[in-house]
Amino acid sequence: MSIQDAPLLDSANMGADGILGVDSLSSQRVVFDFEGQTMSIVPSQSAEAEKEPGSIVVKAKRKKGRLLMTDATANGRNVTIVVDTGAQVCIGNEALRQKLTARNLTDPLEKVQLLSVTGERLSGDYMFIKELVIGGVTLKNLAVVFTDAHAFHQLDLDRKPALLLGMNAMRAFKKVSIDFANRKFRVVLPEASELDIRMASAT
């Protein structure tokens, strides 16, 4: 595969020497082993690997190279989840915030700024979602920044409640496997607590 044109980004904004786009992962599986502190990219797997003790698989659909999960709720309100390993913190859109704040389901904590890989700064409200349920997975006290991120417009999700699932959520698990070809999001729950995963606040 040859690339004729590629964007040139400032490494100070990326925090790395480069970024691997989702377009290169269409037949791959990305595995984050948070206990072993490793990340690996391997071919999509068969169902046998899903038998690891403590694992839960959530089916997803693909849209513009990303995995979306619709079997999800935030504080009891329906929400579309977008897997986003490039986001350090979970990001919610304005439609989701309106759903939650209309019934006092969450309270704003403080104003924050996010820095994108292109150097763009986004202002947002930093809050906690008390409970996020994705398939058979429940996350408690999830730190979220609500802002008008470009990804929501790109995926036609700017007018319906949606959440970019960032790395602060994924680090709650022992392992996370994102299988783009088979459209599956698999997590391995930590042994200490498989029912009540408490989220550490993002910084």
Region annotations inferred by a language model:
Residues 1-203:
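Pepsin/retropepsin-fold aspartyl endopeptidases
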